[in-house]
């Protein structure tokens, strides 16, 4: 099929534009003009479309005059920041061969640094004619420009002053997952005009709460510009979480209270001043263009066959390892460049401290499957800038062989859903969890202890943005997603939750007390385990989503954090702060080497000893007992050989967990004469003001469903 053309064109004097350069890609101002460069291996012509400042009126179309190494490029002298533009790309419309060029569709520059306006759903957005008997093989000639966000040339200048990366060591890292809108929309100290924006997140009172909590790094859900799905808007909902990116360099316009890119940089500077890192959740596995029936917004119309993974036997259709309709092809060098350029932009220009990669297995896929030696994964480790920031993988996707927990290369940390599921099942009271629970408490060495990887490679979590909040985890057996208007069919049914006896809110004081204790148990397990803990914003004071375990579309009070704390919330917050302080005070809780049970002959101790309630080491039979629910974890910091002496590094700690519903007498290990056990944490007694001192060889009554942390201390008398 021959290339189709745009229905309307404008002739422009060719002398206006110069040849420019093929690099860097995107629209870049050099102080005298703007250079435009766009990759397309299969296009026949590219038109640059200029708009007024509102983006509503197309003023001019200019053909990019040069084509060098698959890059269309041109230079507009006297152009300056604030210029609003888009592209129309000509080429064959042959879906069966993977080509979907349609110059009637205005396209977003994949390298755009800022967008103007928002997407307005219309049939004109689609490259084919909706309702046509040929479906997506038909060709639509309507102009999509009135309905598409436009790109804006920016001036990147910003005075950072003395800002620099906080560079918190992994061993001291505690992640805090939050949503830009959700965290500030209901915060009383945030001005109304700043709520739900980067300026709101930079609020001093909000940052004080985060800093006082004891976390080190804020992990923001996606902030790249994204599209609200049409079916959600029709229901009065929207794509709240933002896992539907359309521009990898541009922040979502709604998050800019000022409308200026500098607002993001100002937020980063405020976070760094507070000693906090910023980690971005990034979605490079797919785009908002969907499958073959989706709209033509950007990459599909620029070079569909290069950007996306297509079915090898019928390139009309997309490989869908993301579960969203399409999958980006990072085996293509220019797609790989797009993603790594985006990462370098956010890390370098915007001073971001790290990234969490959504469905990261996709980013390591060749056509034959996942490889930890994929060019993208290797590039991140070798890049002189990216190797300095934190890299966190969500190590799975929806494709064959997509579950890759523990299989990412050294240099990467990974979300560990094995920790989540095992810890939930253990405190729920499921049988046969004890041995697996012990493995998760030691940073899942069975998964990560290889090739010099460290315990912090395991990112431990009990809850995350997708799923129940911590309060809902102990309050609901089943999901309650009716507000999503999908007949409660969305969201997982495998929650491993326990409502403690009643579904949802109750006035029963016994059940409410048990729920509070269970939340303390979860927090104690998370923050006293080896590895890197992640807390979800609001869990620290018992936030609820009323049983909704899939609030992806709830830009409402369901998805926003309520900062009006009740007494239970305030008490839980104080308890969590105490745990984070203890974690930082005792390096043995955040070791740089795995606990493996090795015996140190020089000092006569093991790095970890697993104790049964009778005080003896766990036997094989006890490990295999499906009814076992009580365990002691004796950690001796002296057994870790490290060239650096750190305060508290040689401490000896005893962690006892009891998931039985009844009290279990536990024989505490004997101690040298003059020493004693000091109880630092007891989830059954959260208001314990002073450490409880326990005498030699004490038989301690460990209450049902509780966690104890004890430290070995010398009597000062």
Region locations from a protein language model:
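Carbohydrate-interacting/catalytic domains
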Residues: 1-176, 181, 198, 210, ...
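Core domains of carbohydrate- and sulfate-ester-processing enzymes
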Residues: 89-159, 230-238, 244, 274, ...
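Hydrophobic faces of well-ordered beta-strands that scaffold small-molecule active sites
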Residues: 174-176, 218, 278-280, 355, ...
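Short catalytic/ligand-binding loop motif for oxyanion handling, primarily in non-cytosolic enzymes
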Residues: 94-98, 184-186, 226-230, 286-289, ...
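Substrate-binding/active-site clefts of carbohydrate-active enzymes
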Residues: 144, 179-352, 359-385, 402, ...
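Short, flexible loop/turn elements at secondary-structure junctions
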Residues: 40, 66-68, 78-80, 91, ...
């Amino acid at each position: 099929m021959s290339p189709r053309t745009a229905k309307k064109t404008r002739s422009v004097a060719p002398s206006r534009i110069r040849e420019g350069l093929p690099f860097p890609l995107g629209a870049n101002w050099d102080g005298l003009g703007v250079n435009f460069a766009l990759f397309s291996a299969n296009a026949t012509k590219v038109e640059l479309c200029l708009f007024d400042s509102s983006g509503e009126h197309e003023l001019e179309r200019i053909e990019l005059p040069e084509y060098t190494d698959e890059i269309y490029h041109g230079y507009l002298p006297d152009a300056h920041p604030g210029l609003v533009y888009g592209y129309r790309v000509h080429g064959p419309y042959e879906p069966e061969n993977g080509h979907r060029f349609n110059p009637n569709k205005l396209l977003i520059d994949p390298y755009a640094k800022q967008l103007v306006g928002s997407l307005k759903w219309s049939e004109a957005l689609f490259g084919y004619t909706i309702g046509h008997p040929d479906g997506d093989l038909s060709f639509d000639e309507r102009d999509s420009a009135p309905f598409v966000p436009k790109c804006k040339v920016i001036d990147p200048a910003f005075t950072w002053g003395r800002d620099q990366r906080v560079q918190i060591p992994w061993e001291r890292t505690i992640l805090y997952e939050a949503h830009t809108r959700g965290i500030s929309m209901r915060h009383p100290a945030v001005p109304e005009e700043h709520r739900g924006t980067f300026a709101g997140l930079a609020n001093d009172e909000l940052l004080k709460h985060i800093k006082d909590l004891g976390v080190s790094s804020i992990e923001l859900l996606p902030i790249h510009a994204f599209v609200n799905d049409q079916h959600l808007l029709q229901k009065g909902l929207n794509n709240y979480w933002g896992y539907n990116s359309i521009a990898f360099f541009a922040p979502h316009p709604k998050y800019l209270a000022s409308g200026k890119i500098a607002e993001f940089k100002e937020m980063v500077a405020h976070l760094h001043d507070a000693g906090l890192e910023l980690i971005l959740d990034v979605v490079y596995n797919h785009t908002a263009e969907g499958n073959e029936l989706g709209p033509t917004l950007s990459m599909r119309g620029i070079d569909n066959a290069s950007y996306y993974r297509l079915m090898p036997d019928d390139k009309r259709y997309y490989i869908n390892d993301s579960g969203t309709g399409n999958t980006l092809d990072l085996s293509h060098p220019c797609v790989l460049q797009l993603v790594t350029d985006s990462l370098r932009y956010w890390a370098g220009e915007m001073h971001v401290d790290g990234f969490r990669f959504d469905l990261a297995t996709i980013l390591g896929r060749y056509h034959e499957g996942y490889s930890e030696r994929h060019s993208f994964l290797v590039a991140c480790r070798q890049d002189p800038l990216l190797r300095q920031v934190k890299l966190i993988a969500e190590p799975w996707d929806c494709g064959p062989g997509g579950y890759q927990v523990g299989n990412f290369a050294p240099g990467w940390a990974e979300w560990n859903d094995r920790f989540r599921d095992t810890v939930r099942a253990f405190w729920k009271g499921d049988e046969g969890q004890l041995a697996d629970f012990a493995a998760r408490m030691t940073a899942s060495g069975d998964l990560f202890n290889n090739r010099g990887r460290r315990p912090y490679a395991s990112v431990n979590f009990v809850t995350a943005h997708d799923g129940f909040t911590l309060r809902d985890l102990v309050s609901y057996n089943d999901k309650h997603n009716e507000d999503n208007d999908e007949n409660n069919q969305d969201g997982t049914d495998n929650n491993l939750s326990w409502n403690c006896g009643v579904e949802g809110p109750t006035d029963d004081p016994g059940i409410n007390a048990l729920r509070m204790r269970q939340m303390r148990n979860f927090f104690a397990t998370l923050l006293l385990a080896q590895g890197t803990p992640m807390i979800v914003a609001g869990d620290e004071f018992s936030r609820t989503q009323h049983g909704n375990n899939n609030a992806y579309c709830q830009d409402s009070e369901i998805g926003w954090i309520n900062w009006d704390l009740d007494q239970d919330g305030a008490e839980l917050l104080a308890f969590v702060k105490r745990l984070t302080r203890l974690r930082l005070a005792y390096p043995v809780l955040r070791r740089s080497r795995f606990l493996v049970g090795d015996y140190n002959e020089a000092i006569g101790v093991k790095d970890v000893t697993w104790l049964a309630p009778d005080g003896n080491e766990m036997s094989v039979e006890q490990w295999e007992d499906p009814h076992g629910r009580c365990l002691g974890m004796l950690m001796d910091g002296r057994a870790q050989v490290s060239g650096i002496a750190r305060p508290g590094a040689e401490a000896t700690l005893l962690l006892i967990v009891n998931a039985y519903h009844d009290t279990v007498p536990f024989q505490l290990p004997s101690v040298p004469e003059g020493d004693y056990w000091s109880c630092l944490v007891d989830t059954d007694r959260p208001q314990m003001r002073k450490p409880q001192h326990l005498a030699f060889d004490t038989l301690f009554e460990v209450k049902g469903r509780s966690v104890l942390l004890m430290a070995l201390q010398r009597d000062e008398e």
